[in-house]
Amino acid sequence: GLGDVYKRQGDVKKGITLDVSIGSRSAKSDSRYQGTEAKESRIVSQGNIRIKSDENIAVKGSQITGENVTLQAGKDISLTAAENRKTTEGNSRSKGAGITASFGIGGLQNVGISAGKSKGNMEEEIMTHTGSAVTAKETLAMESGKDLNITGSKAGGKKVEVKTGNNLSIESLQDSHTYHSRDKESGIHLQRDITVRPDTGKKKMDDPYFSIGKKTDTTDSTYISVTKQAGIYAGKEGYDIQV
């Protein structure tokens, strides 16, 4: 820049310098997004709700709410969660090259040539769950001929009555957030300096300086956690569970 003062091994030069550079650069990036989101269904009543099936009763990512709620199935009752998933992918690329020259009072001082390129990619995925909820203000009764499965969901009331012909299973689900990125850069630089010997006043071209640089940055992150506990919840009148 203007007013640069520099000193180098045995050569001393003070004065005004002018830096000139010519170059070009191009860059391109793209991203893709994909997502699915559950929209819950609802059965809501100020009175009683009774659902009976000779086969199975399956509730997924939905709500059933009433004064007294009864679920009766000849086979299985399943309260499960719906999945919400968001995925983002991205890529970027760039490259460039340039020539630089520095001029001082004595003329040309150095010439440099540089070139470089970079590329990167990233992937991110977020998965959450929308659980089912079966809630009674008073009594919740669930009776299955075979299994009662509660996965990532809740069932509750002031009093809860459960009767199964086989198994009772309760399982919480884990939400997750994963992120991966990788960025790579590389470049080269060639430079030659021209100096003036103070004893002779003659110009000489120094040995060329050549450098190569490479860099890679990688990020990997994974977060997994149960954010909502599945379960059967009873109020002051408690549970009556028969398995």
Which role does the model predict for each range below?
Residues 1-243:
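Binding/recognition "hotspot" determinant
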